[in-house]
Amino acid sequence: GLSTNQQIIVAKVINNTIKRGWMFYAVLLPEHSVNSYLQTAEGDFVFDPYINVNKPVALHGFKENESVIISYYNDVFPAAAPAFSEGLARVSAAIKPDSIFTLANGQLTSFTKKGLYLVQKDTTTVEGFAFRVEDGYPKFKHIQDLVGPFVYVCAKDEYDRLRMAGNDKKQFDKSVLAITRDTDRAREFMKTYFSRAEVANHLFTSYKEGWKTDRGMTYLIYGAPTAVYKFADREVWSYGKTDFSFSKSSTLFDPDNYVLIRNKKYAAEWYEKVDLIRNSRF
């Protein structure tokens, strides 16, 4: 349930054709009460927690001509640990910005460096909002960008060969073929697996890329759940007889951050899913 100091925002969506309605809600946390936002040069609101490099945007929601502080982090965050793992892919509790600069409210600017950006009026508080800057996101623009999501379905030596291929497409394709052992399977694997990865980037981008998050990883391996149950403090994804619980763990960088409750019981089915994916059986 909600605590006394929490509020929720509710949206009701009605499809008149089929005469059905859905209710969606989000918990508004006082410690993350930020009214600022990004807007494109064309005046469109940026609803996603990411933008692409060299895309002109402006910060709004502050006082006119008020300067705000932007902290830039170029950390490479780890991919999620498997659902059966006892150890988490932990991130340092305190990450240090690579650089800090200021922008005025409404000032149009383009971010040229990929990474994580945190917007704050006062760096001594725990208020602000963050977004990622990527290239060609949520798609995978370069061959080397494709390597990361393989970490969930590859042995270490296979992953190393993919990484060493650089942007050499011929070597990359050869490494993928060594995993799937069939040209048609390789083609289907790339199409379906990276379609899932793109969706994960779009839906689950946090302080790190969507495919690296716990929910993104689960989506990559299991696909879309048959049902999602949302509670104030957690989400439960149902796949028939298998359920995954994600505990809400809000941070300054991502108020909507969720952490998978891991358990050894998932190991056997997880390996079965990975084996099916490697054989392009989705």
Indicate residue ranges for each PLM-predicted region:
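Aromatic sugar-binding surface patches on proteins
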Residues: 1, 89-111
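A cross-family detector of function-defining hotspots
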Residues: 169, 178-211, 217-258, 269, ...
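Extracellular ectodomain segments of secreted/surface proteins
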Residues: 23-86
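Second-shell loop/turn segments in exported
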Residues: 146-150, 158-164, 199-208
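Short beta-strand elements
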Residues: 15-45, 125-152
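Short, aromatic- and glycine-rich surface loops/edge beta-strands on solvent-exposed regions
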Residues: 3-17, 112-125
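Conserved, structured regulatory domains from eukaryotic proteins
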Residues: 258-264
